[in-house]
Amino acid sequence: MASDKEYLDFILDQLSDLDDIGYRDMMGEYIIYYRGKIVGGIYDNRMLVKPTSSAVAYMPTADRELPYDGAKEMLLVEDVDNREFLNGLFNAMYDDLPAPKKKK
C-alpha cells in the first residue's frame, strides 16, 4: 500500500523547523533526508527511522517494524504530532547516520 502525499506533507510540516529536510519518492513511499543523510522514511503512512543507537535511546520503547518485505527493521515513530519530539529525534540521530554515498 502506498503512502499518501498528504501524510508526507504533514510530516514535512512537522519537520519544517529543521534546516535541509528533503525527501525522495520511492515506489509510492518516501525516503526522508536530513542534511543529506537518510534518516528514515514513510512507509504505508507510518514514519519509520533507522535504529541508530541515539534513536533507540531517544525512543527506548519504540516498536520495530519492517518498512516492506525483505527490508531491515526500523523504529516506528508514534509521536508524529509532537513537532518538538520529531525535531529532537532527528537532531539526536544525525551524528550516528552514515555519510551519503558518493555518486559515481
Residue spans for each PLM region:
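Charge-dense, helix-prone N-terminal extensions
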Residues: 1-104
